[in-house]
Amino acid sequence: MRSDLMKKGVEKAPHRSLFKAMGYTQTELDRPLIGVANSANEIIPGHIHLDKVAEAVKAGIRLAGGTPIEFSTIGVCDGIAMNHAGMRYSLASRELIADSVEIMSMAHPFDGLVAVPNCDKIIPGMLMAMLRLDIPAILISGGPMLAGRAGHKQVDLVSVFEAVGSFKAGTITMEELEQLEDYACPGCGSCAGMFTANSMNCLSEALGLALPGNGTIPAVTGARMRLAKLAGMRIVELIKADIRPRQIATQKAFENAITVDMALGCSTNTVLHVPAIAREAGIDLDLGLFNTLSSRTPHLCSLRPGGPHFLENLDQAGGVQAVMKELLARDLIHRDAMTVTGLTVGKNLESSKNTDPTVIRPISDPYHNEGGIAILYGNLAPEGAVVKQSAVAPEMLQRTCRARVFESETDAAGGILDGKIKPGDVVVIRYEGPKGGPGMQEMLTPTAAIIGMGLGKDVALITDGRFSGGTQGAAIGHVSPEAAVGGPIALIEEGDEILVDILNKRLELMVDDATLKARRDKWKAPAPRMTQGYLARYAHMVTSGSTGAVLRTEQDK
């Protein structure tokens, strides 16, 4: 066993002595030692209950004859970090989470690993670590939050963000806003729509690194705790069979995950995270693959924020497995991909059934013929930009808009809420990319304000930053190259015309080449916003959003 490095032989007597100081018996030490990476904390609603999930995992490990050893890692709540300087740390935390799990699992050579995340950057961070380590591993999440209720209407966190814009526009009262504040988020779990956390939890299941049901079983149910026990039991079997993450997360598995991404209408953040995870397995996923798979994958689910349904509805309809079963009917899924169940995708799907075709549309009757996400290219985004096309109003799929330029997310949010943005405008937020932000902040406050103020059918937003999974509307992010490295977005001036052509996957600055050259000759790189601490190091090392915003090492140069 791998753990023999720290427990076997005469020379390891001091090591065993330290284990015994913590109460481990010799019988426990003789079993497989399994790390349980628990990201529980008291600042994320999706993580507030993870101690209970981890306890269920450990119970499962013991039931199957292993010895669990729990350790912790950090987690940022994107909702609470939103619209202030804290959001710069969210994406950047992904790398620290991956590194911390690597450190703990290499310093203490576990035989296997169970990752217990639930929210936005923690899930990809742990998946990156699993593939980097390539020891037997499984991921079990905490599960989605139930929808809230305000009066007779089901609501969620994004309802509150959008209500701020509605209040500013005078269309709701303070009493109505406070009611939403009190009841939109009823308890523990990842926020209730197909936002980034639930997107990544669903994709971990589609990728094969989590058990069926991981993406959709609600946090508050006994079924979630049973799944956690099963994950604990399953890791012992994965160790015995020596099944490792890179044997599961192959090119075919990533294509399956992206295909499911398109069918579900997942968060645009998946376009950052999936390539970053694949990179740890030595797989290069080009952005063009997202367009290729989107063009052939029907959009089958209309989930919040772009539709009426919540994760609990998707779970009741059969979950991710039922979606994959629909896709399999048209051979859009690789059925021979292996999963942590020890069975192939095809075998897993044999018992799956779509029990509610109003939530999971049959593949013969999709919401849209193309997938939820599109990659746009053009002179404004030579390396690409990302939009959740399934959440864009038809009026904004092809439109020429006037540029209203802001140098930060905070300034843009203020301008929108102060009524300075008019129909036909495109809000440009720049110097918010991975290097420029630094940290590539999410733009949920300005996009929610646009929707809340009734401008969703008339105003677009373009940024080198990124968006919350809760964003809807013509919100185009990850514009690459970013402004801080001299990307074309840095050359936009107030009043410029910009063509947003989602139908043809184009994003064009309608300014002639000579004018752009003159502007470029005058452009100077701004001074770094951060000169000390982690974000200063991050800004120095981070790569483009078009390559997953991963950190560059010396050998990458």
Swiss-Prot record:
Modified positions (N6-carboxylysine) are K121
The note on the cofactor says: Binds 1 [2Fe-2S] cluster per subunit. This cluster acts as a Lewis acid cofactor.
Which residues are involved in binding [2Fe-2S] cluster? Answer: C119, C191
Q: What EC number(s) has UniProt assigned to this enzyme?
A: 4.2.1.9
What is its pathway? Amino-acid biosynthesis; L-isoleucine biosynthesis; L-isoleucine from 2-oxobutanoate: step 3/4; Amino-acid biosynthesis; L-valine biosynthesis; L-valine from pyruvate: step 3/4
The record's listing under SUPFAM superfamilies reads:
IlvD/EDD N-terminal domain-like (SSF143975), LeuD/IlvD-like (SSF52016)
- Write the record's keywords in alphabetical order, separated by commas: 2Fe-2S, Amino-acid biosynthesis, Branched-chain amino acid biosynthesis, Iron, Iron-sulfur, Lyase, Magnesium, Metal-binding
What binding partners and quaternary form does the record give?
Homodimer.
Q: What is this protein called?
A: Dihydroxy-acid dehydratase
**Organism (species):** Syntrophobacter fumaroxidans (strain DSM 10017 / MPOB)
